[in-house]
Amino acid sequence: MDPRARIEAFLAGYAAAHAEVKPLFDNKEKGTSLAAFDAWREKLREIDVAHRNGEFYRQYALSFGSSPDFSPDTVEIEKIEVYGNMARARLARDSRAYGGPIIEMMLVHVGDDWRIETIDDYDEEPSSPLVDKDVLEAWKAAADKTEPMEAQHKEDMPDPAAVFSASWACEALNEDYFEVFLSDTLEWREEDGDRNDPETYAAVRARAIAEMYRNAEVGPVEIQEIGQFPHGSYLAAGDPFGEMCLCALKVEPGVARAQALLTTLGGERCVAALRVILADREPVQWKHAIVMTASARSTDVSSWHEVDTRSGNGTIADADAYFGMTHRQYSRVGRQVERAFLMDPGSGPIGASTYSGRQYGVAQAYWGLDEDDRPVQLVLDHQELWAPADPPEATTGA
């Protein structure tokens, strides 16, 4: 098949598969069953075998809409450009179908046939940047007027460098955990005095929290070297599948070395933190990083003290390179999902990314400063680990 015939066959096959499985999802009395999704996954596998170059069925297997994402009735081929053994097709999707209005398909010539290599949806022009240059410059101007750091919060990892150099560390316990379980550990002793006295209560509460940390799970610490990437005066941090923020603090341009902090808690292996080392000097103090938040098209920017990591992933990257990526390059980066990897949109590494921490929601970012208050490290903490600890054997044997 030529590229156009392959795409037309894919659209027809996808719509037919959707129509065949749809009755399984329409049985509202019994609700959607696992069998319905199993059948849908099997159909998507068949579509992969028939039309695509590799296994991509998982891209659409976790959802099922009332109308197909791809159909000759709702998707129109606008143009196809052939470059030797590769072809790029642009398709338009009307509003009746789920997904972005712009679709790009990359096809590859395999033997005597053309196969679909990738499919990407876009809400904006694929060649447009994630953030327009004038908007990014407005963010930088706002950052320059913002206090870029503040004292560490009480829930912050006290010394990230110590945890990165440890063999074992105890898990972090958030404030919600304290409030739920504090009543079980808030032991009043005769010598404590009046429990209605605020200072007495604060002291007993601090003792109870310390006891909870002593009993917290201890996990092994492993460092994974990710690699190096060049950076300019500003770094970006956050969630590559959610909100990436501009760090307010300016840094000396250079080459950063990235590391992932891995651990195992509750039997689950995860990324606890991501660190970039900006200079060989050791940090002697840590401060909470302030980031600038705004929508991609807005110059109305505000400062904030937390980083939204809703997908559980974390990234630290050169701000100009990251926000300057086109939507097409961003889609390419989105397919590079590994435990820890250098983010490369095709022009070389621009940052480091990890997948994923267990804490879905909020991460903390810290600057490590040298004796002259110059930034030498930036850590994105998923709030998994708190501080170095003795190995479990030593704890239980004491």
What are these regions (language model features)?
Residues 143-398:
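N-terminal domain-onset segments
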Residues 72, 77, 116, 271, ...:
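A broad structural signal for short, well-ordered beta-strand segments within beta-sheet-rich domains
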Residues 76-82, 107, 342, 367-368:
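Short, exposed beta-strand/loop patches in secreted or surface proteins that constitute
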Residues 3, 7, 11, 79-86, ...:
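Low-complexity, intrinsically disordered terminal/linker segments enriched in charged
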Residues 62-66, 103, 107-110, 352-357:
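Short aromatic-glycine motifs in intrinsically disordered, low-complexity regions
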Residues 35-98:
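Surface-exposed, charged secondary-structure patches
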Residues 95, 99-121, 360-385:
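Short, compact, well-ordered microdomains
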Residues 1-62:
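Core segments of small alpha/beta cavity-forming domains
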